[in-house]
Amino acid sequence: MTIEFDRPGAHVTAADHRALMSLFPTGVAVITAIDEAGTPHGMTCTSLTSVTLDPPTLLVCLNRASGTLHAVRGGRFGVNLLHARGRRAAEVFSTAVQDRFGEVRWEHSDVTGMPWLAEDAHAFAGCVVRKSTVVGDHEIVLGEVHEVVREHDLPLLYGMREFAVWTPEG
């Protein structure tokens, strides 16, 4: 199937855009936060990128209807980069299950106190919200990284609507 995006007058639908982005494999993260009542929230996210090294800042794009975004607006969030064995966590946090945190082992991170999926993430960043802006049905959130935990493991990837594992051999 060929989708033409450069035709004059062509209208790109949400389905067209989703199909385009499925062709861009990326790592898989679970964004976590705690709301004002102390309840943890989280969602699977592939819209994540580094912004600057000084100060260390990243951005995530979250659906405006997300309960996780509401908790992130409290000022802090965690980025859990999932390893190859973290697929189940990716699936749990991409569903409408109410008690997602009851399905995985997690703990509060040392510095920011954000939910860290220690058994499913090979890296964790605890962030403080510095700025956010609404674009369409999503909100772009800039987070200054205040905490990093890393382990050596192979990352979980997602592309072409499938999970995969990075292999050093290629």
UniProtKB/Swiss-Prot annotation:
Gene Ontology MF: a single term: FMN binding
Keyword terms: NADP, Oxidoreductase
Lineage: superkingdom: Bacteria
InterPro entries: Flavin_Rdtase-like_dom, NADH-dep_flavin_reductase, Split_barrel_FMN-bd
Reactions catalysed: reduced riboflavin + NADP(+) = riboflavin + NADPH + 2 H(+)
SMART domains assigned: Flavin_Reduct
First-level EC class: oxidoreductase
The protein's Enzyme Commission number: 1.5.1.30
Function: Catalyzes the NADH-dependent reduction of FAD to provide FADH2 for the halogenase RebH.
Similarity remark: Belongs to the non-flavoprotein flavin reductase family.
Protein name: Flavin reductase (NADPH)
Organism, scientific name: Lentzea aerocolonigenes (Lechevalieria aerocolonigenes)
Gene that this sequence comes from: rbmH
